[in-house]
Structure formats: structure tokens, C-alpha cells
Design a protein with these regions (language model features):
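Generic alpha-helical secondary structure
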Residues: 34, 38, 42, 75, ...
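Long beta-strand-rich cores associated with HINT superfamily self-processing modules
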Residues: 95, 108-215
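A glycine-rich, hydrophobic loop/mini-helix early in the fold
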Residues: 55, 60-101
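Glycine-rich, low-complexity intrinsically disordered segments
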Residues: 14, 33-37, 64-68, 94-95, ...
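Solvent-exposed loop and beta-edge segments used for protein-protein assembly and interaction
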Residues: 41, 98-100, 143
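An acidic, glycine-/histidine-flanked metal-binding catalytic module
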Residues: 2-42, 46-55, 166-223
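Terminal, regulation- and interaction-focused segments at domain boundaries
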Residues: 101-107
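Generic solvent-exposed, charged/amphipathic alpha-helical segments
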Residues: 42, 46, 50, 79, ...
């Protein structure tokens, strides 16, 4: 069998866990080179967001960003996603088709801050918007709200410029509170979710939407 995405076809067949895969990957130079691109893309995006945050703070005397959290998809998650989609397990295929290897979650103070930051990023001439999914204006049936952007931005190395995809999730504190606890209830407990609990979760999502609306109204009254 030909070498797979991480040179780990045999390892994957043996069912090695993610930590064991990481140890093997630490010796795989090609993997390290590719992941460096995604790590640097995260740093570049975080730097742009920090600049926007500081500029907004200077102009409006408050920060639109409460916190940021970045992550790289694990090797096993990447491989599983590619296998489910029937993709060839090699680096060019991975880079052309898997757009969420690098991800940033941005927690904002108010709903209007989410759209402000999204617009600022979209207005930057060297950023390409791959996809945009507005689950704030159009929440998912379960009540989930967030703004998802998949972008491609340039990363400058010593001898080359590479445009790397990054997934961005922008949401308010209330949206993140609901999404985090809903995920814990739905997935971490590994228990079936009945219709009554689904209804309760949706009602909580509706309440969080009301909180965002009321807080934004208060902000405008006081400013």
C-alpha cells in the first residue's frame, strides 16, 4: 500500500491512538512542514484580530473581543474526515479539501461586534472568503447561533508566500455559553436526548438570544 497522509497507513490500521500517532508524526518532516503553515496562519489571523480589537478599543473605549481560542485539528480527526469523504490520503488532497484544519473561535461582547469583525476581515484585500454561514440571523433548528467564516490568508515565509485556509467562529458570550453547555449535555454524557430535553435546550437558546438583544439595547442607551 502506498504511503498515506502521514506516512502512517500501518499505524492507522493497527488502531494507534492520537498520542501515539503524534509521536510518530514528530519524526515525519513533511507533516511538520505542512502543519507549520497552519500554525503560522493562526498566528497571522490572531495578530490581525488583535489589531482590530486595539483600534476599536481606542475609538470606542471598549473591547469587541472578550477572548480568542485557536486549535489545530488532530491527525486522527483529519484522517477520519478524509476517509468519510472518500478522499485520497495525501497532503495535496488534504490541503485542497479540508478547510478546517486550523480554527479560531472569537468570543465577542455584543452581537454587533461579531458582524463588525467579520466585515473588517472581509474588507481586507488579501483575505479570500471561501464560505460564510450566518447562524445568527438564521439559527440552526436546535437553536445554535454563531457566524462561521472560512477564509484563506497569506502567510509569508523566508522564500515563499502561501495562502492557507482557516475556519473562524465568531459568537457572543451568551452564544458560547449555550453552545458549550449544549455540547457537554449532548455529547459528553453519551446519553440519548429525548424530545423534552431538545425542547428545553431550544428554549435556553431562545433565552440567550433575548439576553444578547437586551444587552445590546442597554449598550446603546448608555453610549
Amino acid at each position: 500500500m502506498s504511503e498515506n497522509l502521514f506516512g502512517l497507513t500501518v499505524a492507522a490500521d493497527k488502531g494507534l491512538d492520537d498520542l501515539q500517532c503524534q509521536r510518530l508524526l514528530s519524526e515525519n518532516r513533511r507533516y511538520q512542514e505542512v502543519m507549520l503553515q497552519y500554525r503560522c496562519a493562526l498566528k497571522a489571523l490572531e495578530s490581525r484580530l488583535e489589531i482590530l480589537n486595539e483600534e476599536f478599543s481606542l475609538q470606542h473605549d471598549r473591547n469587541p473581543i472578550e477572548s480568542m481560542k485557536s486549535r489545530l485539528k488532530s491527525p486522527s480527526s483529519i484522517m477520519n474526515k478524509m476517509q468519510k469523504r472518500g478522499l485520497s490520503l495525501d497532503f495535496p488532497t488534504m490541503q485542497a479539501n479540508i478547510m478546517d484544519i486550523a480554527g479560531v473561535r472569537v468570543i465577542c461582547s455584543f452581537e454587533e461586534d461579531v458582524f463588525f469583525l467579520a466585515k473588517c476581515l472581509k474588507d481586507q484585500s488579501d483575505i479570500e472568503i471561501i464560505t460564510e454561514k450566518d447562524y445568527i440571523s438564521h439559527p440552526k433548528p436546535n437553536g445554535y447561533r454563531s457566524l462561521h467564516l472560512t477564509i484563506r490568508l497569506p502567510v509569508f515565509f523566508a522564500e515563499k508566500e502561501i495562502h492557507v485556509p482557516v475556519e473562524i467562529q465568531l459568537r457572543t458570550i451568551a452564544m458560547d455559553f449555550w453552545a458549550s453547555l449544549e455540547h457537554t449535555i449532548r455529547y459528553k454524557k453519551n446519553l440519548p436526548i429525548n424530545a423534552e430535553i431538545e425542547t428545553e435546550l431550544k428554549e435556553c437558546a431562545d433565552s440567550s438570544r433575548e439576553w444578547d438583544s437586551k444587552m445590546e439595547q442597554l449598550l446603546h442607551i448608555l453610549t
